Amino acid sequence: MFFTNGVLFSALLPRYPEIKAHFGLSDTQFGLTVVAFAAGAICAAAAAAPMIRRWGATRVTWVGSIVLATTMAVAGGSPSAWVFAAALFAAGLTDAIVDAAQNVAGIAVEKSYGRSIINSLHAVWSLGAATGGVIGAVSAALDVGIGVQMVVNGTVWSIAALVASRLVTSGAAAQPVVDAPAATAAAEAGSPRAWRLLAPLVLLAICGTLIEDIANNWSVLFMRDETTAPVAVAGLAVSVMIGAQFVGRLLGDRMTDRWGREGVARAGGVLIGLGMVVAATSPTAAVALVGFALAGFGSATLVPAAFAAADRVPGLSPGTGVAMLGWLMRLGFLVTSPCVGALSDATDLRVALAIPVGAGVVAAVIAHLASRRRHAARADVVPGDMLEP
Protein backbone atom coordinates (compact mmCIF):
# COMPACT_ATOMS: atom_id res chain seq x y z
CA MET A 1 0.00 0.00 0.00
CA PHE A 2 2.89 2.35 0.74
CA PHE A 3 4.42 1.50 -2.65
CA THR A 4 1.25 2.20 -4.62
CA ASN A 5 0.73 5.52 -2.83
CA GLY A 6 4.21 6.61 -3.87
CA VAL A 7 3.94 5.56 -7.49
CA LEU A 8 0.43 6.93 -8.12
CA PHE A 9 1.44 10.55 -7.59
CA SER A 10 5.10 10.64 -8.59
CA ALA A 11 4.58 9.30 -12.11
CA LEU A 12 3.30 12.75 -13.12
CA LEU A 13 6.21 14.73 -11.68
CA PRO A 14 8.75 14.27 -14.52
CA ARG A 15 6.11 15.69 -16.87
CA TYR A 16 5.83 18.97 -14.93
CA PRO A 17 8.19 20.90 -17.25
CA GLU A 18 5.98 19.92 -20.21
CA ILE A 19 2.84 20.91 -18.33
CA LYS A 20 4.38 24.22 -17.23
CA ALA A 21 5.46 25.02 -20.79
CA HIS A 22 2.14 23.90 -22.29
CA PHE A 23 0.16 26.26 -20.07
CA GLY A 24 2.75 29.06 -20.36
CA LEU A 25 3.25 29.45 -16.60
CA SER A 26 5.99 31.50 -14.96
CA ASP A 27 7.85 30.04 -11.97
CA THR A 28 5.61 31.98 -9.59
CA GLN A 29 2.44 30.88 -11.38
CA PHE A 30 3.63 27.29 -11.47
CA GLY A 31 4.42 27.37 -7.75
CA LEU A 32 0.95 28.70 -6.98
CA THR A 33 -0.62 26.06 -9.22
CA VAL A 34 1.07 22.99 -7.75
CA VAL A 35 0.38 24.22 -4.21
CA ALA A 36 -3.23 23.23 -4.92
CA PHE A 37 -2.19 19.69 -3.94
CA ALA A 38 -1.18 20.91 -0.48
CA ALA A 39 -4.31 23.04 -0.18
CA GLY A 40 -6.42 19.96 -0.83
CA ALA A 41 -4.52 18.06 1.83
CA ILE A 42 -5.19 20.81 4.37
CA CYS A 43 -8.91 20.56 3.66
CA ALA A 44 -8.80 16.87 4.61
CA ALA A 45 -7.97 17.83 8.21
CA ALA A 46 -11.18 16.67 9.84
CA ALA A 47 -11.85 13.68 7.60
CA ALA A 48 -9.01 11.20 8.06
CA ALA A 49 -9.32 10.13 11.72
CA PRO A 50 -13.14 9.66 11.72
CA MET A 51 -12.99 7.68 8.48
CA ILE A 52 -10.25 5.42 9.83
CA ARG A 53 -12.15 4.84 13.06
CA ARG A 54 -15.36 4.03 11.21
CA TRP A 55 -14.17 1.87 8.31
CA GLY A 56 -10.68 0.71 9.25
CA ALA A 57 -7.32 1.80 7.89
CA THR A 58 -6.90 -0.73 5.08
CA ARG A 59 -10.32 -0.09 3.57
CA VAL A 60 -9.78 3.67 3.62
CA THR A 61 -6.38 3.13 2.01
CA TRP A 62 -7.49 1.08 -0.99
CA VAL A 63 -10.65 3.06 -1.70
CA GLY A 64 -8.66 6.27 -1.42
CA SER A 65 -6.01 4.87 -3.76
CA ILE A 66 -8.60 4.39 -6.48
CA VAL A 67 -9.84 7.96 -6.04
CA LEU A 68 -6.25 9.25 -6.05
CA ALA A 69 -5.50 7.39 -9.28
CA THR A 70 -8.58 8.93 -10.89
CA THR A 71 -7.73 12.49 -9.87
CA MET A 72 -4.12 12.11 -11.05
CA ALA A 73 -5.36 10.84 -14.42
CA VAL A 74 -7.55 13.94 -14.71
CA ALA A 75 -4.54 16.12 -13.85
CA GLY A 76 -2.47 14.44 -16.55
CA GLY A 77 -5.11 15.08 -19.19
CA SER A 78 -6.09 18.59 -18.08
CA PRO A 79 -7.09 20.98 -20.89
CA SER A 80 -6.24 24.08 -18.84
CA ALA A 81 -4.19 25.21 -15.86
CA TRP A 82 -7.39 25.69 -13.85
CA VAL A 83 -8.49 22.09 -14.39
CA PHE A 84 -4.95 20.94 -13.60
CA ALA A 85 -5.01 22.86 -10.30
CA ALA A 86 -8.48 21.56 -9.43
CA ALA A 87 -7.41 17.97 -10.08
CA LEU A 88 -4.31 18.45 -7.92
CA PHE A 89 -6.52 19.87 -5.17
CA ALA A 90 -8.71 16.77 -5.23
CA ALA A 91 -5.64 14.53 -5.37
CA GLY A 92 -4.11 16.29 -2.36
CA LEU A 93 -7.29 15.93 -0.34
CA THR A 94 -7.43 12.21 -1.11
CA ASP A 95 -3.72 11.63 -0.59
CA ALA A 96 -3.83 13.14 2.92
CA ILE A 97 -6.51 10.65 3.93
CA VAL A 98 -4.69 7.72 2.32
CA ASP A 99 -1.42 8.77 3.94
CA ALA A 100 -2.92 8.84 7.43
CA ALA A 101 -4.71 5.52 6.88
CA GLN A 102 -1.67 3.67 5.58
CA ASN A 103 0.44 4.94 8.49
CA VAL A 104 -2.18 3.80 11.01
CA ALA A 105 -2.22 0.40 9.29
CA GLY A 106 1.57 0.27 9.24
CA ILE A 107 1.90 1.15 12.92
CA ALA A 108 -0.71 -1.51 13.78
CA VAL A 109 1.32 -4.10 11.88
CA GLU A 110 4.50 -2.85 13.57
CA LYS A 111 2.92 -3.38 16.99
CA SER A 112 1.88 -6.91 16.05
CA TYR A 113 5.48 -7.62 14.96
CA GLY A 114 6.88 -6.28 18.21
CA ARG A 115 9.76 -4.46 16.50
CA SER A 116 10.39 -1.30 14.49
CA ILE A 117 9.41 -1.51 10.82
CA ILE A 118 8.08 2.02 10.19
CA ASN A 119 11.22 3.21 8.40
CA SER A 120 11.12 0.14 6.16
CA LEU A 121 7.48 0.82 5.29
CA HIS A 122 8.34 4.39 4.36
CA ALA A 123 11.26 3.00 2.36
CA VAL A 124 8.73 1.09 0.29
CA TRP A 125 6.86 4.38 -0.28
CA SER A 126 10.12 5.96 -1.47
CA LEU A 127 10.71 3.01 -3.79
CA GLY A 128 7.24 3.52 -5.21
CA ALA A 129 7.88 7.24 -5.69
CA ALA A 130 11.21 6.51 -7.40
CA THR A 131 9.50 3.95 -9.62
CA GLY A 132 6.87 6.50 -10.55
CA GLY A 133 9.61 8.97 -11.42
CA VAL A 134 11.22 6.43 -13.75
CA ILE A 135 7.84 5.68 -15.35
CA GLY A 136 7.30 9.39 -15.99
CA ALA A 137 10.83 9.98 -17.29
CA VAL A 138 10.70 6.99 -19.65
CA SER A 139 7.23 8.00 -20.85
CA ALA A 140 8.53 11.51 -21.57
CA ALA A 141 11.53 10.11 -23.47
CA LEU A 142 9.22 7.89 -25.54
CA ASP A 143 6.84 10.82 -26.14
CA VAL A 144 3.89 9.00 -24.55
CA GLY A 145 0.92 11.30 -23.96
CA ILE A 146 0.68 12.49 -20.37
CA GLY A 147 -3.00 11.62 -20.11
CA VAL A 148 -2.46 8.13 -21.52
CA GLN A 149 0.45 7.52 -19.17
CA MET A 150 -1.53 8.53 -16.08
CA VAL A 151 -4.60 6.47 -16.99
CA VAL A 152 -2.53 3.32 -17.46
CA ASN A 153 -0.47 4.06 -14.35
CA GLY A 154 -3.57 4.65 -12.25
CA THR A 155 -5.33 1.51 -13.42
CA VAL A 156 -2.38 -0.79 -12.74
CA TRP A 157 -1.57 0.53 -9.29
CA SER A 158 -5.18 0.83 -8.13
CA ILE A 159 -5.54 -2.90 -8.69
CA ALA A 160 -2.26 -3.47 -6.85
CA ALA A 161 -3.49 -1.39 -3.88
CA LEU A 162 -6.66 -3.46 -3.65
CA VAL A 163 -4.70 -6.72 -3.71
CA ALA A 164 -2.23 -5.42 -1.11
CA SER A 165 -5.02 -4.41 1.27
CA ARG A 166 -6.33 -7.98 1.21
CA LEU A 167 -2.93 -9.28 2.30
CA VAL A 168 -2.70 -7.19 5.49
CA THR A 169 -2.95 -9.71 8.32
CA SER A 170 -3.16 -7.39 11.33
CA GLY A 171 -6.75 -7.20 12.58
CA ALA A 172 -6.04 -3.81 14.12
CA ALA A 173 -5.20 -2.43 10.68
CA ALA A 174 -8.17 -3.97 8.91
CA GLN A 175 -10.87 -3.22 11.47
CA PRO A 176 -12.26 0.10 12.71
CA VAL A 177 -9.72 1.50 15.17
CA VAL A 178 -11.97 2.78 17.90
CA ASP A 179 -15.58 3.76 18.26
CA ALA A 180 -14.81 7.23 19.61
CA PRO A 181 -17.47 9.92 19.19
CA ALA A 182 -16.66 12.93 17.04
CA ALA A 183 -16.86 15.27 20.04
CA THR A 184 -14.16 13.29 21.84
CA ALA A 185 -11.87 13.41 18.82
CA ALA A 186 -12.41 17.15 18.49
CA ALA A 187 -11.60 17.67 22.17
CA GLU A 188 -8.42 15.62 21.79
CA ALA A 189 -7.34 17.64 18.77
CA GLY A 190 -7.88 20.88 20.69
CA SER A 191 -5.96 19.78 23.79
CA PRO A 192 -3.11 22.23 24.59
CA ARG A 193 -0.98 19.34 25.81
CA ALA A 194 -1.49 17.46 22.54
CA TRP A 195 -0.51 20.53 20.52
CA ARG A 196 2.58 21.11 22.68
CA LEU A 197 3.75 17.54 22.21
CA LEU A 198 2.96 17.47 18.51
CA ALA A 199 4.50 20.84 17.61
CA PRO A 200 8.17 19.73 17.39
CA LEU A 201 7.11 16.57 15.57
CA VAL A 202 5.17 18.62 13.03
CA LEU A 203 8.12 20.95 12.43
CA LEU A 204 10.47 17.99 12.01
CA ALA A 205 8.06 16.33 9.56
CA ILE A 206 7.74 19.58 7.59
CA CYS A 207 11.52 19.67 7.19
CA GLY A 208 11.39 16.14 5.77
CA THR A 209 8.45 16.73 3.44
CA LEU A 210 9.93 20.01 2.21
CA ILE A 211 12.72 17.98 0.62
CA GLU A 212 10.12 15.77 -1.04
CA ASP A 213 8.38 18.93 -2.28
CA ILE A 214 11.63 20.14 -3.84
CA ALA A 215 12.09 16.75 -5.48
CA ASN A 216 8.51 16.65 -6.73
CA ASN A 217 8.05 20.17 -8.03
CA TRP A 218 11.45 21.75 -8.63
CA SER A 219 14.25 19.23 -9.13
CA VAL A 220 13.34 18.48 -12.75
CA LEU A 221 12.94 22.17 -13.58
CA PHE A 222 16.27 22.92 -11.90
CA MET A 223 18.03 20.22 -13.92
CA ARG A 224 16.54 21.46 -17.18
CA ASP A 225 16.92 25.21 -16.66
CA GLU A 226 20.09 25.50 -14.55
CA THR A 227 22.20 22.55 -15.76
CA THR A 228 20.72 22.34 -19.30
CA ALA A 229 20.20 18.59 -18.88
CA PRO A 230 18.06 16.89 -21.57
CA VAL A 231 14.48 15.98 -20.63
CA ALA A 232 15.22 12.29 -20.00
CA VAL A 233 18.15 13.10 -17.68
CA ALA A 234 16.32 15.93 -15.92
CA GLY A 235 13.39 13.61 -15.23
CA LEU A 236 15.69 11.28 -13.32
CA ALA A 237 16.24 13.93 -10.62
CA VAL A 238 13.04 12.84 -8.88
CA SER A 239 14.05 9.18 -8.93
CA VAL A 240 17.59 9.92 -7.70
CA MET A 241 16.36 12.04 -4.80
CA ILE A 242 13.58 9.68 -3.77
CA GLY A 243 15.76 6.65 -4.50
CA ALA A 244 18.37 7.93 -2.04
CA GLN A 245 15.58 8.48 0.45
CA PHE A 246 14.55 4.85 -0.09
CA VAL A 247 18.06 3.64 0.76
CA GLY A 248 18.10 5.82 3.88
CA ARG A 249 14.77 4.46 5.03
CA LEU A 250 15.81 0.90 4.27
CA LEU A 251 18.73 1.41 6.66
CA GLY A 252 16.73 3.63 9.00
CA ASP A 253 15.58 1.08 11.56
CA ARG A 254 19.12 -0.29 11.92
CA MET A 255 20.65 3.21 12.19
CA THR A 256 18.04 4.22 14.75
CA ASP A 257 18.73 1.17 16.91
CA ARG A 258 22.44 2.02 16.88
CA TRP A 259 22.52 5.81 17.22
CA GLY A 260 19.03 6.75 18.39
CA ARG A 261 16.42 8.81 16.58
CA GLU A 262 17.86 12.11 17.73
CA GLY A 263 21.33 11.25 16.42
CA VAL A 264 20.03 10.00 13.09
CA ALA A 265 17.76 13.04 12.64
CA ARG A 266 20.59 15.43 13.51
CA ALA A 267 22.89 13.82 10.94
CA GLY A 268 20.02 13.83 8.45
CA GLY A 269 19.56 17.57 8.83
CA VAL A 270 23.26 18.13 8.17
CA LEU A 271 23.11 15.98 5.04
CA ILE A 272 20.05 17.88 3.79
CA GLY A 273 21.83 21.21 4.15
CA LEU A 274 25.05 19.93 2.59
CA GLY A 275 23.26 18.20 -0.28
CA MET A 276 21.19 21.23 -1.23
CA VAL A 277 24.27 23.48 -1.15
CA VAL A 278 26.01 21.04 -3.52
CA ALA A 279 22.99 20.97 -5.83
CA ALA A 280 22.50 24.75 -5.81
CA THR A 281 26.14 25.42 -6.70
CA SER A 282 26.58 22.50 -9.09
CA PRO A 283 28.29 23.25 -12.42
CA THR A 284 26.97 20.07 -14.06
CA ALA A 285 23.94 17.80 -14.00
CA ALA A 286 25.96 14.95 -12.48
CA VAL A 287 27.06 17.05 -9.50
CA ALA A 288 23.50 18.30 -9.00
CA LEU A 289 22.27 14.71 -8.87
CA VAL A 290 24.85 13.94 -6.17
CA GLY A 291 23.57 16.87 -4.12
CA PHE A 292 19.95 15.79 -4.54
CA ALA A 293 20.91 12.26 -3.49
CA LEU A 294 22.55 13.52 -0.28
CA ALA A 295 19.48 15.58 0.59
CA GLY A 296 17.16 12.66 -0.14
CA PHE A 297 19.20 10.32 2.07
CA GLY A 298 19.29 12.90 4.86
CA SER A 299 15.52 13.36 4.86
CA ALA A 300 14.86 9.61 5.03
CA THR A 301 13.99 9.08 8.69
CA LEU A 302 12.47 12.44 9.64
CA VAL A 303 8.86 11.75 8.65
CA PRO A 304 8.73 8.09 9.84
CA ALA A 305 10.18 9.12 13.21
CA ALA A 306 7.61 11.90 13.57
CA PHE A 307 4.71 9.56 12.71
CA ALA A 308 5.89 6.90 15.16
CA ALA A 309 6.18 9.46 17.96
CA ALA A 310 2.80 11.04 17.12
CA ASP A 311 1.09 7.69 17.56
CA ARG A 312 2.42 7.59 21.14
CA VAL A 313 1.16 11.02 22.25
CA PRO A 314 -0.78 10.31 25.47
CA GLY A 315 -4.46 11.15 25.64
CA LEU A 316 -5.13 10.72 21.93
CA SER A 317 -7.18 7.81 20.63
CA PRO A 318 -5.58 5.52 18.01
CA GLY A 319 -5.19 7.23 14.66
CA THR A 320 -5.78 10.77 15.93
CA GLY A 321 -2.14 11.71 16.54
CA VAL A 322 -1.09 10.29 13.19
CA ALA A 323 -3.95 12.05 11.37
CA MET A 324 -3.17 15.37 13.08
CA LEU A 325 0.51 15.14 12.17
CA GLY A 326 -0.30 14.11 8.60
CA TRP A 327 -2.52 17.17 8.23
CA LEU A 328 -0.33 19.72 9.98
CA MET A 329 2.90 18.77 8.21
CA ARG A 330 1.21 19.59 4.92
CA LEU A 331 0.96 23.22 5.98
CA GLY A 332 4.57 23.46 4.87
CA PHE A 333 3.55 22.64 1.31
CA LEU A 334 1.31 25.73 1.25
CA VAL A 335 4.34 28.00 1.48
CA THR A 336 7.23 25.97 0.06
CA SER A 337 6.47 25.99 -3.66
CA PRO A 338 5.09 29.57 -3.79
CA CYS A 339 8.17 30.82 -1.90
CA VAL A 340 10.56 28.89 -4.14
CA GLY A 341 8.76 30.14 -7.24
CA ALA A 342 8.69 33.78 -6.10
CA LEU A 343 12.35 33.73 -5.05
CA SER A 344 13.29 32.04 -8.32
CA ASP A 345 11.52 34.71 -10.37
CA ALA A 346 13.16 37.46 -8.31
CA THR A 347 16.63 35.89 -8.54
CA ASP A 348 17.05 32.40 -9.98
CA LEU A 349 16.31 28.82 -9.00
CA ARG A 350 19.80 28.27 -7.60
CA VAL A 351 19.25 30.99 -5.00
CA ALA A 352 15.77 29.63 -4.23
CA LEU A 353 17.31 26.33 -3.12
CA ALA A 354 18.50 28.15 0.01
CA ILE A 355 15.05 27.36 1.41
CA PRO A 356 15.66 23.59 1.76
CA VAL A 357 19.15 24.35 3.10
CA GLY A 358 17.40 26.15 5.95
CA ALA A 359 15.12 23.15 6.49
CA GLY A 360 18.16 20.97 7.04
CA VAL A 361 19.49 23.36 9.67
CA VAL A 362 16.12 23.47 11.45
CA ALA A 363 15.85 19.66 11.51
CA ALA A 364 19.33 19.33 12.98
CA VAL A 365 18.58 21.94 15.65
CA ILE A 366 15.29 20.26 16.64
CA ALA A 367 16.99 16.89 17.01
CA HIS A 368 19.87 18.41 18.97
CA LEU A 369 17.55 20.24 21.38
CA ALA A 370 15.45 17.09 21.84
CA SER A 371 18.56 15.13 22.74
CA ARG A 372 19.78 17.79 25.19
CA ARG A 373 16.36 18.03 26.82
CA ARG A 374 16.12 14.27 27.26
CA HIS A 375 19.58 13.99 28.77
CA ALA A 376 19.07 17.04 31.00
CA ALA A 377 15.85 15.58 32.37
CA ARG A 378 17.57 12.20 32.74
CA ALA A 379 14.40 10.61 31.42
CA ASP A 380 14.19 6.87 31.42
CA VAL A 381 13.81 6.58 27.65
CA VAL A 382 15.30 3.84 25.56
CA PRO A 383 17.64 4.84 22.68
CA GLY A 384 15.67 5.72 19.60
CA ASP A 385 12.71 7.44 21.32
CA MET A 386 12.96 10.92 19.81
CA LEU A 387 10.89 13.77 21.28
CA GLU A 388 9.15 11.30 23.55
CA PRO A 389 6.21 12.88 25.43
Give each language-model segment a name.
Residues 13-28, 217-233:
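Short amphipathic helix-loop junctions that connect adjacent transmembrane helices
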Residues 19-20, 51-52, 138-143, 223-224, ...:
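Interfacial helix-cap and linker-helix signal at transmembrane-aqueous boundaries
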Residues 44-57, 140, 248-261, 344-345:
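Helix-to-loop junctions at the C-terminal end of transmembrane segments
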Residues 97-112, 301-314:
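Intracellular juxtamembrane helix-capping segments at the cytosolic ends
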